Amino acid sequence: MQDLYPSRQRADAEMRPRLDPVVHSEWTNDAPISARQAAAFDRDGYIVLEDIFSADEVAFLQKAAGNLLADPAALDADTIVTEPQSNEIRSIFEIHAQSPVMARLAADARLADVARFLLGDEVYIHQSRLNYKPGFKGREFYWHSDFETWHVEDGMPRMRALSMSVLLAENTPHNGPLMVIPGSHRTYLTCVGETPDDHYLSSLKKQEYGVPDEESLAELAHRHGIVAPTGKPGTVILFDCNLMHGSNGNITPFPRANAFLVYNAVSNRLEKPFGVEKPRPWFLARRGEPAALRVERGPLVETVPA
């Protein structure tokens, strides 16, 4: 397969145009989001959905997340990532396969139907995780495009995927919220340097390869600005796979947590990685022939046992 988005192959970074649509469906009155929201996603590369879950559903999700964090021994050890300088849990991967509540969340029509509309296809979960940024100790995560990594290290061929961050704690301007460069999703910023074997073992704690150069980042930030979407628990932040994003550390006493779901179009199934010989492991990237997600409707608390 032709590599339409080469990266980590040259000595200098390049800004290349995006070759894929952002919104893959024509908006109609039957769409799960408004015309204004669809236009905003196309223009900015992200939107924020508020008040789509009830207070009971949010509490239900928070309890499920707390159960995952409280009993790491019950989880697959490979799926747990700790902070760089401590044993504090930073992320738990494959939550949709390790928690019935998170599996039901991933399949919920309020999320999955939006993904199906924006991607113009049936979808499956490429990756899922619970992110936790503890108070005082939560470390930063540097600027990056998810697609650059998914393309080079996982073999995702096209920009036909998106992420949804379901906030499980209040995201404020101060506790290390997600930051995005709106509009950056229309530029593919290549990275410099060959990727070492088993790069994921270190990159999940601190990424050193597949990192954008400062000059290009500055140009994107000056061109588009930087936004930090915030919200109360239950808020959902959707963003395109190529949107440049990152987060600061959390030196406040207020932890930040979110359930993170990556939806990929079934037609965009992973191929051989475009930049490495050995693909990343199963809990970071769903390989093989994907089955379309079976969308479920109704309140979370009525359809999943506690």
From Swiss-Prot:
Cystine pairs: none
Catalytic reaction list: L-ectoine + 2-oxoglutarate + O2 = 5-hydroxyectoine + succinate + CO2
Activity relative to temperature: Optimum temperature is 40 degrees Celsius. Active from 5 to 50 degrees Celsius.
Superkingdom as given in the UniProt entry: Bacteria
Chain sites annotated for binding L-ectoine: Q127
Iron as UniProt keyword: yes
GO terms of molecular function: 2-oxoglutarate-dependent dioxygenase activity; iron ion binding
Keywords in alphabetical order: Dioxygenase, Iron, Metal-binding, Oxidoreductase
Site (Important for ectoine stabilization): W150
Pfam families given in the database record: PhyH
pH dependence, entry free text: Optimum pH is 8.
Cofactor: Fe(2+)
Metal-binding listed as a keyword: yes
The enzyme's E.C. designation: 1.14.11.55
Positions bound to Fe cation: H144, D146, H245
Subunit composition and interactions: Homodimer.
NCBIfam families referenced in this protein's UniProt entry, alphabetically: ectoine_ThpD (TIGR02408)
Free-text function comment from the UniProt entry: Involved in the biosynthesis of 5-hydroxyectoine, called compatible solute, which helps organisms to survive extreme osmotic stress by acting as a highly soluble organic osmolyte. Catalyzes the 2-oxoglutarate-dependent selective hydroxylation of L-ectoine to yield (4S,5S)-5-hydroxyectoine.
Family of the protein in this entry: Belongs to the PhyH family. EctD subfamily.
Protein name per UniProt: Ectoine dioxygenase
Organism of origin: Sphingopyxis alaskensis (strain DSM 13593 / LMG 18877 / RB2256) (Sphingomonas alaskensis)
Lineage: Bacteria, Pseudomonadati, Pseudomonadota, Alphaproteobacteria, Sphingomonadales
Name of encoding gene: ectD
